[in-house]
């Protein structure tokens, strides 16, 4: 996917550190490869099951080993300043809702940035709006939990914002 290569190259050139699941497959492996080739530091957060199944990437500069997926999500959220959701499946949704749920009860004030490539997240975003209108989600109208980037340029502009994260968590 062109958008992943482009994002990886930008992150590398900006000398960012990427904290990710550390698997040797999927869009994050594509980003990690492009980012590392351009100077980024990679930290893979790897649950035992990935190691057991031989799915650990060789790209990370550092590996953090976890017992399970719950621990993995906790470490990624704790160690990250910014959390970007690329198009993905069940695992991506699990991570997104983990971040937003933890924010709703005050564990942190970090937002998910939905990288809404080709409108991938439109249906989910509409569902979240419907839940907010039904008063099942509070704070959504103030963008407390997420931001949306519909293009690479929008994503970069969001990532460049100086006060995007609350590091007092």
What are these regions (language model features)?
Residues 10-17, 81-83, 109-111:
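Short, surface-exposed connector motifs at secondary-structure boundaries
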Residues 1-41:
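Glycine-rich beta-alpha loop segments
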Residues 25-85:
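Acidic/glycine-enriched connector segments
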Residues 46, 86, 103-126, 139-141:
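Short, acidic/small-residue loops that bind anionic groups at enzyme active sites
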Residues 71-106, 113, 164-169:
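Active-site/ligand-binding-proximal alpha/beta "capping" segment
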């Amino acid at each position: 996917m062109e958008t992943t290569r482009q994002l990886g190259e930008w992150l590398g050139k900006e000398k960012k550190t990427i904290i990710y699941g550390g698997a040797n497959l999927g869009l994050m492996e594509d980003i990690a490869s492009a980012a590392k080739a351009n100077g980024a530091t990679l930290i893979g957060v790897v649950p035992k099951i990935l190691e057991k199944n031989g799915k650990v990437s060789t790209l990370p500069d550092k590996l953090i080993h976890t017992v399970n997926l719950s621990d993995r999500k906790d470490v990624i959220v704790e160690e990250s300043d910014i959390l970007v959701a690329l198009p993905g499946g069940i695992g991506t949704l699990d991570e997104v809702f983990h971040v937003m749920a933890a924010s709703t009860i005050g564990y942190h004030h970090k937002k998910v940035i939905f990288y809404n490539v080709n409108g991938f997240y439109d249906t989910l975003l509409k569902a979240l709006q419907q839940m907010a209108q039904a008063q099942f989600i509070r704070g959504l109208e103030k963008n407390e939990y997420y931001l949306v980037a519909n293009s690479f340029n929008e994503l970069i502009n969001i990532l460049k914002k100086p006060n995007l994260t609350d590091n007092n968590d």
